[in-house]
Curated annotation (Swiss-Prot):
The lineage of its organism: Bacteria, Pseudomonadati, Chlamydiota, Chlamydiia, Parachlamydiales. GO terms for cellular component: ribonucleoprotein complex; ribosome. Part of the 30S ribosomal subunit. Belongs to the universal ribosomal protein uS10 family. This is Small ribosomal subunit protein uS10. One of its GO terms (molecular function) is structural constituent of ribosome. It comes from the Bacteria.
Amino acid sequence: MAKQEKQPKSARQKIRIRLKGYDQRLLDRSTGDIVETAKRTGAAIAGPIPLPTSCEKFTVLRSPNIDRKSREQFEIRTHRRLIDILNPTSKTIDALKTLTLPAGVDIKIKA
């Protein structure tokens, strides 16, 4: 068996992509597109890793005048995913730049 060469940590490259959105299906579809694009160009993938969902609740009065006890609650759930692309090539970076994602997905990329 051939031994794998270990590269020093400074020589390894990694792109970390964090996705955030309110719609879980849209977010999963976007992560699938990113993973498929990266694998097609020959990069190694770690993820998608589901991060904890944050839930923000808002309480409002149902009536503007009376009946303070009558309230209604709304919540916004923010779903998050993490993808690491290990040892990306120039093809990978170009393919990710041309990738179009839906409007409901926020993306942050760290190199």
